[in-house]
Amino acid sequence: MTAQTLYDKLWNSHVVREEGDGTVLLYIDRHLVHEVTSPQAFEGLKMAGRKLWRIDSVVSTADHNTPTGDWDKGIQDPISKLQVDTLDQNIKEFGALAYFPFMDKGQGIVHVMGPEQGATLPGMTVVCGDSHTSTHGAFGALAHGIGTSEVEHTMATQCITAKKSKSMLIAADGKLKAGVTAKDVALYIIGQIGTAGGTGYAVEFGGEAIRSLSMEGRMTLCNMAIEAGARSGMVAVDQTTIDYVKGKPFAPEGEAWDKAVEYWRTLVSDEGAVFDKEYRFNAEDIEPQVTWGTSPEMVLNIGGKVPNPAEETDPVKRSGIERALEYMGLKAGTPLNEIPVDIVFIGSCTNSRIEDLREAAAIAKGHKKAGNVQRVLIVPGSGLVKEQAEKEGLDKIFIEAGFEWREPGCSMCLAMNADRLAPRQRCASTSNRNFEGRQGNGGRTHLVSPAMAAAAAVTGHFTDIRTMA
């Protein structure tokens, strides 16, 4: 039998029907639903007189539009409130396996909520009307974002039409150095292969450094796969995966658990499996990363300097650097560790889990917010993450440092709620995108790890965390 990649196994086990042009009908196991991309889909079902094909495939929460402060005042923005209220009504009418509404204890960012509830399991196909659905591939699942029309198709038929991507292996061999996190690995890889490097591919991450990551680290890595242009990112199942899933609310139990684990252990690429493309990196080459421009590929080690466009021979790239420097208000040759910040945001579906908050708290403990830093927002990814952080006293560490301890939600990752940057404000952010205006009109975003963000908060500028006691 031909050796198969993990992607081959996941894809082949979900093909319902093949068309002659390479298009297939692909079965979907889990559909994650939030308030932004679902209203039109639910309306389409109503107009056609349809119901959900499988109510027990749907897990839903409100996240993009929900405020992270002053919950006693409710949702002030009328459009945001309408979207959240509409989700409430649609779930009440159509049903779901689980729904975590605004202010519910389990509410949170959909890509944090799903895994912590055990709604994401190895071997599943997972879709959501959100580009960072690739996060769930960390479980040995095939996960990717879909558009609103596909959201409706999934609701009505439990299938989508798709063409198989090419396969790519990205391996990080060796051990990561102290102070280097999954976020740094992700940014480093994007810096090496570019934001189009994974276009047309489903990426499997492997190698010793990847296997050493926790599930939360793997989720960070797979979350960023889309920023390298990939359709999806995934990590093979191992004991780390199984241990994380065990005991989660929607995980199998008893005999069903034993059977599931037996199957899950097969969700690895076979020995001798051939990938369409491979990249291999030495983990020891990876340092703490900071983006300097308006694309995740515009990234350097913390010890680097803002590049000089005059040194770029490619006219298209040179023009891109010039535009980025103008927007970001930076001068060529400026050391990254001398760039001051105005705002710090620690949160998003990339870095708002309990381990991320622990990393940030370890840096913040015993320090105070720097005088030039206007605000530091700490936004847990879910109500359960917030509860755990408070049990550990992390909230007290942040508050004593002068940081804001917020309620769960997408927050400042994107300018779709009350948390946003003002023009020209410079932000050290643990989110996943640094495009122009992503965090607010004219806002300047630098992507970093939670520890690096916390270091910037207390020093007032980007700082190599390895130099801090």
Curated annotation (Swiss-Prot):
Residue sites binding [4Fe-4S] cluster per the record: C349, C410, C413
- GO annotation (BP), single: L-leucine biosynthetic process
**Which catalytic reaction applies to this protein?**
(2R,3S)-3-isopropylmalate = (2S)-2-isopropylmalate
This entry's Enzyme Commission designation comes to: 4.2.1.33
Keywords (alphabetical) are: 4Fe-4S, Amino-acid biosynthesis, Branched-chain amino acid biosynthesis, Iron, Iron-sulfur, Leucine biosynthesis, Lyase, Metal-binding
Iron-sulfur as UniProt keyword:
yes
Pathway given for this chain reads: Amino-acid biosynthesis; L-leucine biosynthesis; L-leucine from 3-methyl-2-oxobutanoate: step 2/4
What cofactor does its activity depend on?
A: [4Fe-4S] cluster
Cofactor: how bound: Binds 1 [4Fe-4S] cluster per subunit.
**A single GO molecular function, which one?**
metal ion binding
Q: Superkingdom, according to UniProt?
A: Bacteria
Q: Could you describe the subunit structure of this protein? A: Heterodimer of LeuC and LeuD.
Q: What does this protein do?
A: Catalyzes the isomerization between 2-isopropylmalate and 3-isopropylmalate, via the formation of 2-isopropylmaleate.
Its family remark reads: Belongs to the aconitase/IPM isomerase family. LeuC type 1 subfamily.
Official protein name in the record = 3-isopropylmalate dehydratase large subunit
Specify the taxonomic lineage.
Answer: Bacteria, Pseudomonadati, Pseudomonadota, Betaproteobacteria, Neisseriales
Write the gene name.
Answer: leuC
